[in-house]
Amino acid sequence: MNNDERLCSIALTLCPGIGHIGAKRLIDGIGSAVDVFGHRNELPELLPGVNSSVIAALDCPAAFLRAEREMEFVEKNRLTCLTLRDETYPSRLRECEDAPIVLFFKGNTDFNRLHVINMVGTRRATEYGKQFCADFVHDLSVLLPDVLIVSGLAYGIDIHVHRAALADNMSTVAVLAHGLDRIYPFVHRKTAVDMLANGGLLTEFLTGTNPDRHNFVSRNRIVAGMCDATIVVESAAKGGSLITAD
């Protein structure tokens, strides 16, 4: 039996048909990803609702092979792999039913400080919106200098939020809709690198994952779940920012 919680957590995300909610329920019920696999055959007796299809899904050697490759990337690039059992995992996010059971992080920050907010908005930011970001973040730097500011590194409001935070020496984290083997959009790479000293880049996605449309919706639940409040600066009536706020 493998006793690496990180490896087992990654493998669990790759087991077909388990999903975010199912994976978290298994870990919450049994205690760890290691124990989910170690007690696979006894799960129906230990956890109500676990049936033979779940047992079959957990018998997935390919998931462990892929997880091993991911851990090689993590260690080679000095990334941090956070599982639900880690004290440094975002505590607010851990309380969400669909919290990811593993996160990948590059940077330096405390996700569990007293105040964490996210600022999001349209990719077609107006001059007013850009100035609001700068002014609001500056005011925060005076009133709550230890606040962590979260956004998504996207065009428009997101990137202006990150740059405003950097300008005021505040910690800022971008939650990404792809793996840490790339930066999207690439034009924001310099800002992303600048964030690593006091903030960083966070994702639930494995390397090789493209920034596909549905990944942004999944990403938004992390942005909202790890924060105390969501501030929508500008948004279309059906924009992704309002999905985050909801």
List the predicted regions and their residue ranges:
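Short, positively charged patches
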Residues: M1-D139
